[in-house]
A protein has these predicted regions:
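Cys-His-centered catalytic/binding microenvironment captured across papain-like cysteine peptidases
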Residues: 236-243, 252-291
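Bacterial Sec-dependent N-terminal signal peptides
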Residues: 1-20
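Short, flexible loop/turn elements at secondary-structure junctions
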Residues: 74, 82, 87, 224-228, ...
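Short, flexible beta-strand-to-coil junctions
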Residues: 149-164, 223-230, 252, 265-267
Length: 291
């Protein structure tokens, strides 16, 4: 206004940049009250494998500490985690409303009136994902990410439209760039601008200068080629398209390098890249005017 999650937020070395808006404390309090009310009213009818203690602890943590939101390893939930990071920051009440609706009734409506539905396969699988790091006990994330993956489809999902065990690690869960921006508009109700594509980066001069300009009054989300960002990562990439979405906190120049300070995998991370490598890294630049 987020296979190591999410978005990255940018600043320049000589100009103050806009970060994602700080979470409104009153909105956070109202969101936490909604969580407490939902916890008291919870019935385990729809979700046989959800542990309510894990679920509500996870939901509270996401509202209180959006930076900690994590996609799990080695899933393709990166885009959903990035979206959730942003939504929990800018509209924690809407985020809680959507997740609690899905928990209580198995469906919810987004701001653009899209119906998100938890299918029988999703309801039975949520709570059973394991060997995913901290996601093993993040049951709210399991519910929410799986519902998003099942409700929004792009061309990467055509051959795997229905969840099957292990689908979180492959094409069923993948997000291409156009799908990600569509989800972002749907969930936030905000005007979303995007430059770039899955197979080629934005056609323009300096990426750095463009991001610097847009980040003065916008939150900037980058679509990155993870094979360039993390060439030695332990898991195997199976997609030929970029796979990583990050929300940038700072971008500055240090001699021959661009230094990125960004959020992904539940942390803020800093990385120094040569300028030519930075251009190879970026495939999409999404920006949203800060409210």
């Amino acid at each position: 206004v987020i296979k190591r999650l999410l978005f990255a937020l940018c600043f320049s070395s000589n100009c103050l940049w806009a970060q994602p808006p700080a979470q409104n404390p009153d909105a956070q309090k109202r969101a936490l009250l909604k969580i407490s009310a939902a916890e008291k009213a919870y019935k385990k009818d729809l979700w046989p494998n959800i542990n309510p203690a894990y679920f509500f602890a996870n939901l509270r943590k996401n509202v209180e500490h959006p930076l900690y939101i994590h996609q799990g390893k080695p899933t393709y939930f990166c885009g959903y985690a990035a979206l959730t990071h942003l939504l929990a920051l800018v509209d924690p009440e809407e985020y809680v409303k959507l997740v609690v609706d899905v928990l209580q009734s198995g469906h919810t409506l987004t701001k653009d009136h899209k119906k998100l539905t938890a299918t029988k396969e999703i309801r039975e699988a949520a709570g059973t994902l394991y060997n995913k790091g901290e996601m093993d006990i993040n049951h709210a994330d399991q519910v929410w990410f799986m519902v998003l993956a099942d409700s929004y489809k792009g061309y990467l999902n055509w051959k795997n439209p229905t969840y099957k065990p292990g689908g979180e690690n492959g094409f069923w869960a993948a997000s291409n760039y156009k799908k990600f921006n569509r989800m972002l508009r749907s969930l936030t109700g905000l005007e979303v601008h995007a430059r770039g594509a899955d197979l080629i980066g934005p056609i323009m001069g300096s990426y750095y200068d463009f991001i610097e300009e847009k980040n003065e009054e916008n939150t900037v989300i980058l679509y990155l080629n993870n094979k360039v960002l993390y060439p030695n990562k332990f898991f195997k990439f199976i997609l030929r398209t970029p796979t990583h979405f990050v929300v940038l906190y700072d971008l500055k120049r240090e001699g021959k390098y661009n230094v990125l300070d960004y959020w992904d995998y539940g942390l803020r991370t800093q990385m120094k890249l040569r300028k030519n490598k930075f251009r190879k890294l970026v495939y999409g630049i999404t920006y949203i005017e800060n409210q």
